[in-house]
Structure formats: structure tokens, C-alpha cells
Amino acid sequence: MTISRTEQRVLHVLALGGRILHERGEGPKITTITCVTRDGLILADCDLAVFSRLRRRRLIESRAGGPYRLSPLGRAMVRPQSDNQGHITC
């Protein structure tokens, strides 16, 4: 499975303890998302299109309506980066 650079960046943030907060509109559809690092910074690269691709591939999951986190499949797909401390420049 090929993963784009943006998707890889989002998966790496989630692997380091980040989460994706979501809001729903009138119906069941998710209208806005915010990718937050474990330090509370917001990742600007994460938009609704990237979120939809990650969710469709089952790389992220939400449990009991909580924030989206990395699934076991997503954890296996994350490529290691030289930045192991989790310092992301936003």
C-alpha cells in the first residue's frame, strides 16, 4: 500500500501520541477535523481529504465516539523517521 508524504506525517504524529479531533454537522458526516500532537500543537497538513483516505484504509480508528487514533494496522504502516522526539514544525 502506497502512502503519501502527508499521510505518513499524520501517521507519525499519531504514533507519537497525537490524536485527530472531529466535529459532526447536522447528520452523521464529519465536517471538520483537527490533528493535534501530544504537545497540543496543531498539524496544518492534516485536512479532510487526508483524514478520509486514512480512515478508508483503516489506518486510524475511533472508539466510543472519541478522538481518532492510530489503529494496529496504521502502527504497522508507519515508517521510522530520524525525528524520534516528536518535535514537529508546524
From Swiss-Prot:
It comes from the Bacteria. Signal peptide: none annotated. InterPro entries: YjhX_toxin. Coiled coil: none annotated. HAMAP family: UPF0386. Belongs to the UPF0386 family. This is UPF0386 protein Rru_A2144.
